[in-house]
């Protein structure tokens, strides 16, 4: 262990049973039909089906109740779909342990082919679902239908119409119909509101689950617990003690294979306006009156509505060199592959504290983290401020971890200071615990009817209100992207903006993950 780490013994994890009883939704019985629309696409193969398999393998999907349907335009058989997804469900290391479960899971999958705007296709889908419900003796319980739209947003309206017209729950004994829609939810405020109105005319808000997989990440979900269950942070979490907040997303690869798609959206629409802004809400929100989903989402909306308009001088856009070499990208593209923007929240807790949102592709590393940087110690008698400030870092990926950067005495005979850390690395503390993937958690929440980690319509609207004016200026070429080298930290102008915002970088400090 490093000199500044906590000593963490392996011990049983204590659970608060009263919390579990109060906030876990009641388990329902009856048939459960999970319909994956866009079943032959990359999202379904790489994320949706693997998440469903892991839930099945862990016992969260009862084979006596559940059946999974794939729907897409591809004319393939049940077995061909199973073959397409088989390789994504288990890795070589765990294949032998999961052979039996994999076989049982694949047998639950049935495929229906048809267009996304065709009555006949959805009538066939409904017939297949009804046959499943009858075989599962739905008369003994409710009929539940979950539609996962692993599709481009352009087909959400026609698909939603077909589901509403032909495929909703028909049981007299209760149950539900729910739809899950993926980002992007529009390209700006107007298109997002239009999409919301089209879907909202067909389904009630409690039926609509707008998924942002960042809200399913373990340490993102930990944010409310960290803030409101630990007395340590309560008096510190404000403008009197915090100098700035940085929320960072980096990828070490470019847009290979999807340059044309990415060029329509850019890094702000792809990452910052949704993923990073959702994290900001959890960092900045006030304590909700309870853990009910609506109370939490009410507080998130208040944060978004308190963000003042973004200033162009507090934005740096970048585009990595070689991006336009992709034949699907226009030669004169101004689409940013990197952006740093400062958001400011006009309320009593956060006035004057810059929230720095930063995301980029083709950078020097792949990671995502939250950095809460505290102010300097007043009257510093050790003269050590140039070594760096206290900083609470939450590493979202890879290798989930939390650590607090502290100044301590360096071991030895002299009174010298050095930066170290108090460290909680999840892989060390929870060696025997399987940390679920974000999609597993969110799909399970959907089945349970828990909307806490999904985006509400007014929340979506408020998020687009923040970024739409800036995005329109970028689209018109009024804010330019500057070039940066692949494998770098991004444009130098971004570091200058951070310095101007008051972020103090700790030069020479490197966090070393503990050895297991």
From Swiss-Prot:
Pathway: Carbohydrate degradation; pentose phosphate pathway; D-ribulose 5-phosphate from D-glucose 6-phosphate (oxidative stage): step 1/3. Regulated by metabolites. D-glucose 6-phosphate binds at residues 183, 213-217, 251, 270, 361, 366, 397. GO terms for cellular component: chloroplast; cytosol. Disulfide bonds: none annotated. Expressed in leaves and stems. InterPro entries: G6P_DH, G6P_DH_AS, G6P_DH_C, G6P_DH_NAD-bd, NAD(P)-bd_dom_sf. NADP(+) 2 binds at residues 358, 367, 371, 395, 403-405, 423-425, 489, 511. It holds the Pfam family G6PD_N. Keywords: Carbohydrate metabolism, Cytoplasm, Glucose metabolism, NADP, Oxidoreductase. It is found in: Cytoplasm, Cytosol. Optimum pH is 8.5. GO terms for biological process: glucose metabolic process; pentose-phosphate shunt, oxidative branch. PROSITE patterns: G6P_DEHYDROGENASE (PS00069). HAMAP family: G6PD. PANTHER family: GLUCOSE-6-PHOSPHATE 1-DEHYDROGENASE 5, CYTOPLASMIC (PTHR23429:SF12), GLUCOSE-6-PHOSPHATE 1-DEHYDROGENASE G6PD (PTHR23429). NCBIfam families: zwf. Catalyzes the rate-limiting step of the oxidative pentose-phosphate pathway, which represents a route for the dissimilation of carbohydrates besides glycolysis. The main function of this enzyme is to provide reducing power (NADPH) and pentose phosphates for fatty acid and nucleic acid synthesis which are involved in membrane synthesis and cell division. This is Glucose-6-phosphate 1-dehydrogenase 5, cytoplasmic. It comes from Arabidopsis thaliana. The lineage of its organism: Eukaryota, Viridiplantae, Streptophyta, Embryophyta, Tracheophyta.
